[in-house]
Structure formats: C-alpha cells, structure tokens
Amino acid sequence: QGAVDWRKVKAAGIEFAVIRAGFGMYENQTDPRFAENMAGAKEAGIPVGIYWYSYAASADEARREAEICRKVIEPWREQIALPVFFDQEYEPAIKAQTRTVRTEMCRVFMQSIQEAGFRAGLYCSLDWYLNWLDRSRLAEWPVWIAHYAKKCGYAGENLIAWQYSARGRVDGVSGDVDLDEGYEGLLPARRNGWGQSGKGWYWYENDRPVKNVWRKTDGWWYRLGPDGRMLTGLQEVDGRGYCLNPARGTVGGVYVPEGACIITDENGAIL
C-alpha cells in the first residue's frame, strides 16, 4: 500500500489501526514500513495493535515467530494499545497439519506474547476459525474474524473485532484497504493514575505517562523519571539528592541503604 498519510487517515474518522510488524521466523522479515507506520500513527494519535503473519508449521516454529515478533515490537511497547494478533491463514504447510497442531501453534504464539506483557489475540477468517481450529481450546483468547458479509458469522464472547471488507477506501491510503469494526475489549479503557508495565510503575493522565515531575497520592510524594517510570532508591533531582523508598518510590520516610547513614530534610532531600 506504500506510504500512508496518517494525518489524513485520522481526519477520515479512523479510530484504530492494526499494523503488520512482519512475518515468519526471522528478523529480516520485519515489515519494511513497520517503524514508519508506527511513528506516523503515533504522531496522528491513532491507537494501534500489531499483527504477525505466520508461516509456522509446528509449535516450535510458532514459538520462534513469537520471539522475533516480541523483539521487533518491544521498542514500541508503550504505543501498542490493542492486542498483538497471530495471523494464521491458508498456507500449504499450515493446512497440511492436524487441527490439534494448528490450534497449538496459535496457543503457543499467544502465550509467548502474553508472557512478554502484551495483550494477545488471534486473527483468521470465519471459515478457518470454525473448521480448521479447535475453538474449545481458544475460547480464552480474543479473536478478530475476517468475514466479508453484511453481518459477522461469529458472535462468541471472545469476538473483539470483525473485518468486513478487503476493498475499502480510506483517505491517506493508496488502493484497497481492509475495513474493521471493533467491539468491547479491543480498545482498553483510558488509563488515569497508576499503571504497571514491564519496566515498572507509571502515572498516567489521559492514557499518557507523565514524565519528569513529582506527583502526590495518598499522602506520599513520588518522582516520575524521564521515561515516566517511578524512581526508587537514591536519586538526583534538580541538583538535589533524594532517598526514595525502594519498594514504593515514596518520599516522606527515611530509607537507609545497607551500610549507609543518610540524613534527609522533611521533604526527603539528602542534607
């Protein structure tokens, strides 16, 4: 589809996008426009999810695909608001496997993604989900179904998105584009207050981490660092040393590292 003008996409009323990160088991199979698309969507303020197109023909290969996917998307972790989808389709090597093996490949990929701290889901056609996979072993996972009809042919509780057309047109994108409808659970509620990610605790305001400021909650002061992460231990802030509780990141008590003697003022600054 070439370069995407994400500002035009946003102006066209698009509320979310799922961007291809890559395919297969090797890092050189990263989508060449992945970083460009992620940056453009971020600048335009469009929430994004990820999909990884699979060629895996065994659980081990699916695990390898998940590992590569995780590596590729990690730098964009804070931007990824929607699930990371495993895209399993009608590749000959996949069709040649049993239903049990195909289902296990889905589970292995999604479990690996979830273990890395991302939300995980499955993308496939309605026919694939109903006839090529064991749905009873996938009911716990969100599913995004492609079914080009007036109404989605699947209405299970785990349905979070329906792709209803492959021939849509959106200003800012050249040629045909897939069109989707999102349901409850696709977009997370906007975060306000404390939230935890793989690196630590963050304070969110309107879904964005606050950076380089003090925040007071429940009677305690917390310092948020340059990446928004709550700071702990001995820290220098604006030229002054602070002793922040190693467990809570708070100022207000005296934390003395083992073997040290530290005196602080009433604000927690080291004297």
Please tell me what each predicted stretch does:
Residues V48, R119-G121, V143:
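Hydrophobic anchor at the start of a short beta-strand
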Residues F23, W52-S54, Y90, L126, ...:
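A mature extracytoplasmic/lumenal domain signature
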Residues Q1-M110, Q114-A116:
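Substrate-binding cleft of extracellular glycoside hydrolase catalytic domains
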